[in-house]
Amino acid sequence: MAASRPLSRFWEWGKNIVCVGRNYADHVREMQSAAPSEPVLFLKPSTAYAPEGSPVLVPAYTRNLHHELELAVVMGKRCRAVSEAAAMDYVAGYALCLDMTARDVQDECKKKGLPWTLAKSFTASCPVSAFVPKEKIPDPHNLKLWLKVNGELRQEGETSSMIFSIPYIISYVSKIMTLEEGDIILTGTPKGVGPVKENDEIQAGIHGVLSMKFKVERPEY
């Protein structure tokens, strides 16, 4: 039976945005954090999606909004407690996402031992590219990601540098929560995260696959 909702527009109906933190060793070092023994997980709401053409919004409560460039895995069917060996059978495709982060707020949350919700889960905190079918990326661990702010290269990394592989992450997450068709998993960011401000232009891409562009705005409320 054909899907009633197109995966090519997963951001319009997908329920869950699962994010993996500290999955590149170089980013762990730049954040002066300890390397994790298991994936570090947090969630964003579906209202965090900002498809290309819409702006990145700066929350009123932060003075230090950062970009984090990430490969996202788009789930193609319901996934519960799957093995690492079978995990890729549940993948429909990929996208490029930004995990926009209120870094000053996150730092305070860390100091107080609080969740990162205020720092990570605000409206438009997950800018997203077009959907890329699985067939167009035969090896998701052999990609080069890049990000520029106002034409200046900020982030450049290879997915081969992930600490936890995509099959491992899918299996791990699926044993904690059921993943549904249209859900995505953000797989972590390489080094080079940094601040953006109102009127900046963010460009990002996967070499040889796609690129995307966003304007940073401050909402009028």
Swiss-Prot record:
Cofactor(s) in the UniProt record: Mg(2+); Mn(2+)
A cellular-component GO term for this protein: cytosol
Keywords recorded for this protein, A-Z: Acetylation, Cytoplasm, Hydrolase, Isomerase, Lyase, Magnesium, Manganese, Metal-binding, Mitochondrion, Phosphoprotein, Transit peptide
S-S pairs: none
A GO molecular-function descriptor: oxaloacetate decarboxylase activity
Pfam families documented for this protein: FAA_hydrolase
Residues making up the signal peptide according to the UniProt record: none
E.C. designation(s): 5.3.2.2, 3.7.1.5, 4.1.1.112
Compartments where located: Mitochondrion; Cytoplasm, Cytosol
Modified sites of kind Phosphoserine: S37
Binding locations of Mg(2+): E68, E70, D99
Feature: transit peptide: 1-24
Subunit structure: Homodimer.
Function of the molecule: Tautomerase that converts enol-oxaloacetate, a strong inhibitor of succinate dehydrogenase, to the physiological keto form of oxaloacetate. It is thereby required to maximize aerobic respiration efficiency by preventing succinate dehydrogenase inhibition. Also acts as a weak oxaloacetate decarboxylase (ODx), catalyzing the decarboxylation of oxaloacetate (OAA) to pyruvate and CO(2), and as such is likely a regulatory enzyme in the TCA cycle. Also displays acylpyruvase activity, being able to hydrolyze acetylpyruvate and fumarylpyruvate in vitro.
Protein name from the UniProt record: Oxaloacetate tautomerase FAHD1, mitochondrial
Origin species: Bos taurus (Bovine)
